Design a protein with these regions (language model features):
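Short strand-connecting beta-turns/loops that link adjacent beta-strands
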Residues: 12-15, 24-25, 72
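Short, well-ordered strand-loop elements centered on a beta-strand within folded domains, enriched
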Residues: 14-21, 86-91
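Short connector loops at helix/strand junctions that flank enzyme active sites
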Residues: 2-4, 31, 73-76
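Active-site beta-strand termini and strand-to-loop segments that position acidic
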Residues: 9-13, 22, 81-83
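N-terminal first-folded block
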Residues: 19-32
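Unchanged
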Residues: 36-118
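Charged phosphate-binding loop/patch that engages nucleotide di/tri-phosphates or the phosphate backbone
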Residues: 115-133
Length: 133
């Protein structure tokens, strides 16, 4: 079974979230993340994906699990990371742009999987709860 993970970055100073514009044919907006390799733990894979996609090391940040979605072919884990200030991500070739946006002002089009995650009441409630902590 394929395992993937993504992470919401939330800036305390601006109350905004980081989104990345994918370079694939659909050019949808997503969050940092990707496939976890067979020899990695979930957190090791998430750390690697953040280094590869936005050149940030999250190994010393508090990472909070938000959701696990499971179907017949894959498992997708969603995480949350609060940062003090917005940062400028150094993008790899998987992305061609980024934006820090306010909640409920998400860029469009969202990647379909992320759209479903954001519109899941439990995820919205968890994000709201941990934004304030």
């Amino acid at each position: 079974m394929n395992v993937s993970a993504g992470i919401f970055f939330y800036s305390e100073s601006t109350n905004r979230y980081l989104f990345l514009l994918r370079t694939d044919k659909n050019q949808s907006w997503s969050i940092p993340g990707g496939k976890i390799e067979k020899d990695e733990t979930l957190y090791e894979g998430l750390i690697r994906e953040c280094r590869e996609e936005i050149s940030i090391d999250i190994s010393n940040y508090k990472i909070i699990p938000i959701q696990q979605f499971v179907n017949n072919t894959f498992v997708y884990h969603t995480f949350f990371c609060k940062v003090k200030e917005e940062f400028i991500p150094i993008l790899n070739d998987e992305h061609c742009g980024y934006a820090w946006v306010l909640k409920n002002s998400y860029p469009k089009p969202l990647h379909p999987g992320l759209f479903n995650t954001i519109n899941f009441d439990l995820v919205r409630d968890k994000l709201k709860l941990i934004e304030g902590n």
